[in-house]
Swiss-Prot record:
Pfam families: CbiD. Belongs to the CbiD family. SUPFAM superfamilies: CbiD-like. Pathway: Cofactor biosynthesis; adenosylcobalamin biosynthesis; cob(II)yrinate a,c-diamide from sirohydrochlorin (anaerobic route): step 6/10. One of its GO terms (biological process) is methylation. This is Cobalt-precorrin-5B C(1)-methyltransferase. The keyword Transferase applies. One of its GO terms (molecular function) is cobalt-precorrin-5B C1-methyltransferase activity. InterPro entries: CbiD, CbiD_sf. It catalyses: Co-precorrin-5B + S-adenosyl-L-methionine = Co-precorrin-6A + S-adenosyl-L-homocysteine. The lineage of its organism: Archaea, Methanobacteriati, Methanobacteriota, Methanomada group, Methanococci. Its EC number is 2.1.1.195.
Amino acid sequence: MSKIDFRLEKTFGYTTGACAAAGAYSALYFLKNNEKLNFVEILNLKGDSLIIPIKNIEKRGNTAVSTVEKFAGEDIDITNGMDIKIEVILENWDDGYPKPSNVIIIGGTGVGLITKSGLQIKPGDHAINPKPREMIETNLKSLLKDDEYVTVKISVPTGDEIAKKTLNPKLGIVGGISILGTTGIVRPMSNEAYKESLAPQIDVALANNFENLIFVPGNIGTKHAKILLNAEEDQIIEVSNFWDYMLDKAKEKGVKDIMVFGHAGKIVKLAGGIFDTHSRVADARNEILCAYASLVSQDVEMLQKILQSNTTEDIVEILTEKGILSEVFNKVSKRVVERLSLRWEGINFSCIVIDMKGNILGKSD
């Protein structure tokens, strides 16, 4: 078990789920003890202690509203700095009233509403994931008497606008962000929250009975998969740079058939065994394409140009002029399939590589 004091910590951050748990605890504590806390110490589900600052807290009667500012540490997170408001209403059970839970959690403005099947939460409910719900309940129950219960309402004033820059609209989560986080801790450069938002795409696809999924790096792949492959929105899985993570999830969930489809600049990295395609991890595009071009032509001048090219599009132009474009990218596509099949056994892979305009450069079969 460890303790992280986020009043001092600058490297690690805390999740939206941890914000909600901290805010709920501070609001209930204020109602019970008439004392405003500038910070609270809560436990995550692993038993780690998280000390989280409280930005503001107000009380009116049996209701208190706490505001917690999301902090991502050194991680890149679109939700960093946004306010999360947690309203807690403290009440007593009526005699004879059934008591299913003494912590009721609901979503308010800026928290998304689920509209598609396949996610961890059923359609019609707000996008507050099970682990954050459990963290809130665990921390509040220590403050409650047997005859007391609370309603916890989570709102995000800027959630609707922020959600437009996330995958929530694609997942059928409308009107706001999701409240996420397994451990409550955001680790630098881990992109945990972002990864956690990517994986549910697979659940939605499987819930809609798609057997062949199309994995794309991002918007270019999505756009042209719809045009060239007549693919449906829920069949297309945006991977971003996290091929290893998303393919692990696909295998875990029993996916049997995956087409890798997208722009050459990202897909060629897979042929080199690079499964996190962010440029800060590795950028061997020129070297990989030079190697495959050398299998087709030993023109040293051409190979030198490939190595010195600024963009993948420049290399496409060089290979086109030489008349070997398709031959090179067919080899690249086949190697992508070989690489992925070796690591993720049991999944049938295929691959199509395109340029920015959606022209097919190469296929695995």
